[in-house]
């Protein structure tokens, strides 16, 4: 998708892509799951000013969208047939 673009535009696109990826990987730059308008860094700063105490992140858990969900492979027609045959 970058083949026919001028050199200056290619550089800007690549810089944008790298920055976007770094934002996804860095905890402090990620969006807060309960309020997508806040980054984790902004949330921590808000809570520091609210509490008047310093806050340090000691540990965190990483969640991936859809992780841990198992797709069910139920066959509804087969289920109904089994129920009918059982009676």
From Swiss-Prot:
Role description: Associates with the EF-Tu.GDP complex and induces the exchange of GDP to GTP. It remains bound to the aminoacyl-tRNA.EF-Tu.GTP complex up to the GTP hydrolysis stage on the ribosome.
Keyword Chloroplast: yes
Primary location recorded for the protein, binned into one broad class: plastid
GO cellular component terms given for this protein: chloroplast; mitochondrion
Keywords attached to this entry: Chloroplast, Elongation factor, Plastid, Protein biosynthesis
Lineage: Eukaryota, Rhodophyta, Florideophyceae, Rhodymeniophycidae, Ceramiales
Species this chain originates from: Antithamnion sp. (Red alga)
The protein, known as: Elongation factor Ts, chloroplastic
HAMAP family per the UniProt record, alphabetical: EF_Ts (MF_00050)
Gene: tsf
GO molecular function ontology, one term from the record: translation elongation factor activity
